[in-house]
Amino acid sequence: MLAPTGRSRILQIHPTRRCNLRCLHCYSLSGPNQREELSEELLCSAVEDASAEGYTVVSMSGGEPLLYDPLRAVLDKAHQCGMVTSVATNGMLLDEKRLNRLQGSIDLLAISVDGIPTAHDKMRNNPAAFKTMANCLPYVRQSGIPFGFIFTLTQHNLRELPWVAEFALNQGAQLLQIHPLDEVGRASECLNGSSPDTDDNASALLAATQLDAHYKGRLKIQLDLVSRNMLMEDPKRYFAHQQNDSWEDEPLSELVSPLIIEQDGAVVPLQYGFSRDYAIGSLYDAPFSTLAAEWKDNKRRSFGDLCQRGHKEITSSNTRLHNWYSTVSQLSCVE
């Protein structure tokens, strides 16, 4: 149930900052007036190269990826490379026409829901956000595309988690992913101080465990936190182990995952907004394959050292649960 870093090797793509909403917790400052986006050719080439480097999953986010016209082309390229595909969306644009166009291209839809309807609308900065999303769910079920919900956990909405889980089950979702708020982008301005604290994380684990037992496999519950014990037992899983020269021939996916492609073409480790000091590079400067080779030569060790520092910080603390990606990302930005 605790799964901040799985065994899958994930390429997360943010192709556009264009969005139909201006959510309070948006990490990328996306909105209706944004037009920055990456070309189909650039992303399809990157996906093919990433597959050769061992990445097995392409996850499309945004912005709102349903507003990215070449979405299907990128997803189909991923399928051609043998990769699994997912799309994270606010769910408001999942009409029958769009879903028909995307049929066969998406392996999993991840739809955002941030609490009871009024709380969801407030977070989404739109009084019709929940109703519009909910009205699209019959089309999602009709499409046959497997789907789940993503719930952003803050200091203020844990009590709404049981309602969200019951809503997810009743709508036919397979998964409920609970993701702690990261105070980056617009969230740093609009939700400053709202990230879950130590007590909130502990309460979230208890609630998630109870929900998991209650639904008994009918709804998978995933909490995006890592326990201190997990880090101590398996540092390699978090790229926090001692690296040696034998790693020079390893594919990039064995050195960093998730890998993030941001809307400006930057390729960074682990999480949107990660320090560019550790960036794999920019897709506008060189092909993905070239960037990967250069990163292995020039930055692999420094990234490994950073992960080891994050590992030490967490395992030497008395706190049981941690947001691994956020911890390492914050360390990357303060050096």
PLM ranges: what are they?
Residues 19, 23-26, 252, 270, ...:
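Short cysteine clusters
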Residues 68, 94-96, 158-161, 268:
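Short, well-ordered alpha-helical microsegments
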Residues 81, 105, 112, 122, ...:
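Radical SAM enzyme [4Fe-4S]-AdoMet core and its adjacent flexible, acidic
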Residues 1-3, 7, 266-335:
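Flexible mid-to-C-terminal extensions adjoining Fe-S/redox cofactors in radical SAM and related proteins
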Residues 64, 92-93, 115, 154-155, ...:
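Conserved beta-strand edge residues that scaffold enzyme active sites
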Residues 1-101, 105:
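Conserved alpha-helical substructure of the radical SAM core
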Residues 26, 58, 109, 176-179:
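Hydrophobic residues within beta-strands of alpha/beta enzymes
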